[in-house]
Amino acid sequence: MDATNKQYALRDRAELSAFVNQPFRNNSRIKFTCFDCSPKYFVFGANSGSLYLYDRITTSFLAIFPSQLGTIGKVSISHNEKQIAIGNQTGSIGILSTELAPSTDGEGQPIDLGGPAFVTSFCWTEDDRELYCGDSRGIVSLIQFSLFMGRNILNISLHPVLLLENRIVQIDRYKDLLLVSTLSKCVLCNTAREEFKQIGNRPRDGHATTTTTTPSPPLMIVDEEDVRIFCSRPGSRLWEADLEGNVIRTHQFKQAAAAAAAQQQLQCLQESELATAPTEAPDGTLMVVPFQVLYSIRRQLLLVHDRCQLLIIDPLHSKIVLRTDEFTDITHVAVVDEWIYLLTGENRVFQVRVEIQGDEDPFPTPGMVDEPCLESRKQKQGVYILDSMLNNNNNNNGKQMNGKESPLLLSTEATIKEALVSVVRGKYGRNIKQMFMGYEQQQQQRTPSGAPERPKTLNLTKIYEPSRSNAFANGNGHALLAEFGIEAEVEDLECDDMMEELVQTRTGQALLGTAMPNGAGTGKQQPGKKKFSTSLLDGYETSEDDATVRNLYLIFRSSIISNLNFADRYAKIFDEYDTETIVRLLRKLETLMEENEEPNARLKCMRIYFHYLKPELLWEIDADSRQFIKDGFIVCNTTDGADRARLERLAHCAACGYYLEATASCHYREIGTSLLQYYWSRKEYDECFAMVKRVPYLWRTITRYYIQDRREDKVVQCVWNLADSELLERAAGELPFELDHWRQLFELAIAYHQRHEMICLSCDKPTGGRLEDNQPESQFRQWNYLLGVALAHIRSPTELLCLVRRYADNIPRGAIAPSFYIRCLLLEAK
């Protein structure tokens, strides 16, 4: 029966409170704080820290599991129903075994999340050997464990896999894909490739939840392209996305309050399609249900709720099929098959069943799917599905397939016309077109020996270029339909206007080709979708550089979304190439980032590489690569807003533009000093000072080279400008400083304090402008500190006293402590 003729109802409503509360009927202080259910069990967490286990079918009490974890905040039963994950409200996680006798240490080895955090969501993997848990800090962690002799859970380890900004609301999983929702966004994680993608671009303020729904067509043959992701949005809206994380459409479920009042009773309700725009009641009010956690019923319907309402949605047809407000104070909901279980206030538990009228088998079990038929269907891709239908029709009269009815012929008559429609209009149409175009391309590129030469890079424009001799290419296959008297649908024509891209960008550009609609002469680019991968083009070869750049960019995007450091993944790629090749890849990666409108693309590329680069390699690479690294080092220290603000606060020479002082630190210091050391050793001083002019921290390295080379004409000025105690003491001891050096230093100090003047370290011209006084520099420029260092390195204290007396008129009264004179007299007496 068509979905528009189905009717939905809530049946078998019952209250289970009397059975559930039986174990502690005489203790009113125990309250349920959470619960979960499976085909076999109910499990309730309580404020006492204990877990209560029940049989779901008979509602009989089975066992109590005491624990020392305190109030339980979250529970989750594994798929095999042998383990229960529990999390308390103070950040501890425990794993219980339902097959062990209850004991005080039933939770095995509790894990502490650390910090002020608590578990907000659990998600088991299919084999139940791993458990994902999300907490209130926005961290998703993977718990791996094993059972030892069925006695205790050992070797539990906690590995953070995703770091987000705020609380995790819900986690769901489909094969290798992990869906994580927070209060502001939804993230799709490919756990096999360690790739992360945010679903949609607009953040939300509230519970952003996700779930996957697998539609159930009449043949029960589901392709991955039919699996959908649904994310809740503010204002009773849902985002529908595919498994690549691309938002397909938005569902609006606002309804007028007056209209909602007519659907409050618990009975069979005819589904009604909602308008795209919200309707208003006569008083102008709108009924908005805040979608929090999404539950899937048989992976076909969606269940959402608030404190007093249940809504059941058919997401494929964008309809609310059931609504009831009979229950109040709903705190927790769980779903098993078509059964819905509710935990409300005062320890009340209800059950209700979803029924579809007009459907012979609304919820078939997975076991009813014929495995041979399913496997046979999976093996037929592209043109082979057409061949299968024709062969079955001719050889078996369209009725038998491996001794059973063919699932492809159960719902439709297999005619050539219908087969061609399904192939050309369906998802295989472009595959067929690419097969023919690929063959034509090979025929045109045959070598003199007669063997076809496959292109090294994929030229998308050439692949999709129409050919008069190719019916599939001419009109995207619609010419073939026209021969059979079949009209192409408008949506098919619109879909074919857009060409597939290898690496889709936000601006509609691709890495190896540009997606242009028909009539590309207009100059407008068609925005495309961002994907994890482009499986449609997997059959074609790309250049090694382009494939590597794509991988680097995917890793980069994953690191941005997950807030994790993928240095090991970058290193695995870079280890396969020499420096010259890596530089070439980074330049291409920068171009790709710019096409995707990534701000500061050069900065991000260099940070990726500098986390991998070993400074000692700078002595062995070619000049072009070294120049690239030098420029990247400057970019890393001058691009970020905080770095620019720090540089703007520094005084600089009005004549030559060099900074008069140095910053306290810099990024990638070892790389910068290694570059400076390389150029200095080869007397390439212009390269050195070009770096110093942009990154003034390197004045410290230059000063060390001055001390090493005994450049007495530069050392005193550098030491004073940099206000570095380590450099002053090193210079005073290694040169060593004589009386004349101290005289120069005192004159620089007097010029600074009286005229706010400093000497440029590059052009030796005096420049006005007082430096900002920070605590280390202020202490360095005090007379007591300078005289203390001088007294420790000068030969005769009497000479130092004479020098001080010479500049007595320029030294403020009280600037020199009496203890200095006492020390001079004591040293002279010795």
Swiss-Prot record:
BP GO terms, sorted: developmental pigmentation; eye pigment biosynthetic process; protein targeting to lysosome; visual perception
GO MF assignments: pigment binding
Coiled coil start-end: 578-604
Gene Ontology cellular component terms for the protein in this record: cytoplasm
InterPro entries with a match to the protein in the record: Beta-prop_HPS5-like (IPR056499), HPS5 (IPR035431), TPR_HPS5_insects (IPR056446), WD40/YVTN_repeat-like_dom_sf (IPR015943), WD40_repeat_dom_sf (IPR036322)
Keywords recorded for this protein, A-Z: Coiled coil, Pigment, Repeat, Sensory transduction, Vision, WD repeat
Record-linked SUPFAM superfamilies: WD40 repeat-like (SSF50978)
Ranges occupied by WD repeats: 25-64, 67-106, 114-153
UniProt record similarity statement: Belongs to the HPS5 family.
Chain's role: Has a role in the biogenesis of eye pigment granules. Eye pigment granules are specialized forms of late endosomes or lysosomes. Biogenesis of pigment granules in the eye requires molecular components required for protein delivery to lysosomes.
Xref: PANTHER family: BLOC-2 COMPLEX MEMBER HPS5, RUBY-EYE2-LIKE PROTEIN
UniProt name for this protein: BLOC-2 complex member HPS5 homolog
